[in-house]
From Swiss-Prot:
Record domain KH-like: where: 352-436
NCBIfam families per the UniProt record, alphabetical: GTPase_EngA, small_GTP
InterPro entries linked: G_ENGA (IPR031166), GTP-bd (IPR006073), GTPase_Der (IPR016484), KH_dom-like (IPR032859), KH_dom-like_a/b (IPR015946), P-loop_NTPase (IPR027417), Small_GTP-bd (IPR005225)
Protein's recorded name: GTPase Der
Protein family according to the UniProt entry: Belongs to the TRAFAC class TrmE-Era-EngA-EngB-Septin-like GTPase superfamily. EngA (Der) GTPase family.
Amino acid sequence: MSVVAIVGRPNVGKSTLFNRILGTRRAIVEDYPGVTRDRNYAQVTRYGTPFVLIDTGGFEPASQNRLLKQMREQSELAVEEADVILFVVDAKEGLTPSDDEVAGMLRRSGKPVLYVVNKVDGDSHEAAASEFYALGVDQLYTVSAEHGRGMDDLMAAVLAALPAPAKLDARSCEETRLAVIGRPNVGKSSLINRMIGVERLVANPTAGTTRDSIDTPFVYNKKSYVLIDTAGIRRKGRVQQKLEKYSVIQSLKAMERAHVVLVVIDAEEGVTEQDLTVAGYALERGRAVLLVVNKWDLVTKDHGTMKQYTEKVRHAFKFLPFAPIIFVSALSGQRVSKIMAEVEKVAIEFNRQVPTGVLNRVLEEAVLSHAPPMVQGKRLKFYYMTQTGVRPPSFVVFGNRATGVHFSYERYLSNKLREAFGFSGCPIRLKFKDRNARE
């Protein structure tokens, strides 16, 4: 997934622009129970194109102030991660030496940079904005982030500058792609190395199509898999708080190309908000999910510890009741071999296709057992169900007033599908259409 970073000096309106981009099209990933959205980054979809938007604190190149130096480091890290950079300047304050220095740094990055002159609230401010051509740029985007002026042109330029989505080769239709997602120091690298060692690597690692990730093809039980490793989150010399934030962004980029997501949890620390966040994004993107509790060897245990811990994880991830939970130790190798055995099962479920006749027998039995509620005082009748896709399993139910189905009944039918067919680790996409909408 592409990344767009907003950088610039403090108080030029970066956060206002960030909020404006989010607010102009409310297609941000929705929160799931227990999931909090970091206000400094968000996944956005514009005209069918998803990207991650980053807001930075501010960029003061020459400052020795500790806070401002930290903000500068944050901006530099955002530039490293970005595919497109929005460099925001202030039309009312005018061109400053700091603007010039930041522009030079951005040019050296080699990344596409859009120069955004903010606080141009009307035509009378356009003339003042022209002085920023002194930065040596061919085009300026004059906007008012506060009022929305000029945003359509800016967003069109952003979408045009984004790199084309990576195209998977024909082999990708037959292989299962795994993303191992975890916070820094959760033991993700050790787990990956242990998995590769256990499963006997049969192909050399190759550079992935997404920057800062490595694709490692391997074979398990005569089936092809590709492990997507977010190598970019393991940088030395970075402050932990920054790594926490940018590891989420790396996770989003990795899971965009994955089929199955392994969310790695630190058994000692327990479930964190970041664990919930990346799992929520995986669910929203329709990925299969496994919850892997690592460092289980470090937990003091008795006969009921695993059961109690499982209950805690289930409660935290209550929006993923279908996700298998595996307790492992990457250090000792304990139960690591069970991960791929479970992945193999989930991959089969993720690609499961159910004949229409079988589906409709399940639908009929479900309705007989529990009739759907009335819609606007009239009886709801279902005609048939059909499967429309896999990865994730997707279904459509046609009826006379199907679009009025209550979410509780949708959940009931989803549970009936799971009872009948399994779909372990897989989200189910279930839609309802009126019979006249079949075409």
